[in-house]
Amino acid sequence: EISEKEQRKRFKKLEASADTAWRVTEADWERNRCYKKYARITKEMIDATNVPWAPWTVIDAAHKEKAALAIMEAVSSAMEAALEKKAAGRETPRFEPPLPPDKYKKGILSRVDLEKTMDREEYRKKLDQLQKRLERLHGDLYRYRIPVVLGFEGWDAAGKGGAIRRLTSHLDPRGYQVCPTASPSSTEKAHHYLWRFWTRFPKDGHMAVFDRTWYGRVMVERIEGFCTEEEWHRAYQEINDMEAHLVHSGAVVLKFWLHIDK
């Protein structure tokens, strides 16, 4: 089970420094107090949206540097697969319509190995290799005009921002955009909740990295009462359909959940 205690520990560490205290809000503490409810809904959300065309990759975030390597490895592998398919002239496969949430394979979170470790020397060697690999692949994706959508979710203080910085540190800044997701503006509220994400999806050959995503609809908005039960139930199908549209149009879609457990 996810540790409420570990999250509190990270919040207190952030609050102890004047440079990082601003990152912890009362809303963060409130979510920590509702920890068990969030844990249950997180499992439901991942099980319902872990689809073949846009599967979740659950990352052990207890060790932030190791987490960054796992993310970079997954992104690199997905890029290489997309480039190979493009070079071979293969069409994007068509998937069957999404299944109802209760029909998906369950338990992805429970299968994550949170006991792996890595020494410092091995980490630095792998980091250098992966950064060079990503730099090369980023250029290849631009030449082949393949768009990439990366979505990062996870527990508060799990290290999403640090993982994104390590991932993008050697990429050409002209070819990617980091999209932090805050509360919707009045203009965004006047549209369908997915509209504000559609407007930030990348053009061909570019990458969009979302720090928090459209999954807020079935998590934060659901728990805090910003949408009705009918709306968040419907959102599972809408999200699966949206991701299928992206993949069918040739995009690479990867979703990461940063997991902590102590």
Kindly give the residue locations of the regions a language model identified:
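Glycine-rich phosphate-binding loop of ATP-dependent small-molecule kinases
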Residues: 1-262
